[in-house]
Amino acid sequence: VVRAFADTLGGAGVDYEIIIVDDGSSDETPRVLERLRSEVPALRVVAHPSNEGYGKSLRDAFAAAAKDYVFYTDADGQFDLAEMLAFLPLLDGGNAVVGYRVGRAEGALRRFVSRGYNLLVRVLFGLKVRDVDCSFKFLPRRELQALGLHSDKFFIDTELMVKLKRAGVPVLERGVRHLPREHGRSTVSPTHIFTTLREIGGLLAERRKKETGPEPGPRTSEEVD
């Protein structure tokens, strides 16, 4: 994946950096990344001593980013990274361009759950994107780093898109081919459903708090009738 990024972006003449988050891996990943750093000078590694979650990994990568735009994707080979190049002309310096999966290489149940979840966030948050969890997104770095993201889990994609909407960041969508998984396996489990429901409640409460404003403080003696 690192070499594919470097070949794709370097060949296009793009000023880039590559940030890999090693989320507490217990295999040969740290040594592989160390070797790659000598081959790819643009590579930076953020290492977690233990597994801290998908959302925390993304938040740490976002915080470490230094270029004008942040692109993120997973390392499981389900996207052709060359499709990034078709997104570049759509960037205008302050907008986000997010992918939606075309020809999803997943089972019927997974597709059904995804459609239901996208409908849910559309109803609850007015979020009019086709595929909120598609991990193929270009985001303006300054606006991204100012969002105040909190999720450590898979809800990070939804929180990100909801807060981009609240911040008034324009969002464009573009289809991206979805390929069978090449590496690893999905770590989503039934417990993530309950975590997501709890985080949805928290984000709704945050919205209500912003809409109603802060609780009024105690009045001074001059304000008392």
Give residue ranges: language-model regions.
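Short, well-formed alpha-helical segments that are part of the catalytic scaffolds
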Residues: 1-9
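Terminal low-complexity segments of carbohydrate-biosynthetic enzymes
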Residues: 3, 198-225
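Residue-level recognition of beta-strand->loop/alpha-helix junctions
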Residues: 20-22, 47-49, 100, 175-177
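Acceptor/aglycone-binding surface of glycosyltransferases and processive sugar-polymer synthases
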Residues: 48-64, 69-72, 78-154, 181-203
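Short active-site alpha-helical segment characteristic of glycosyltransferases
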Residues: 79, 156-163
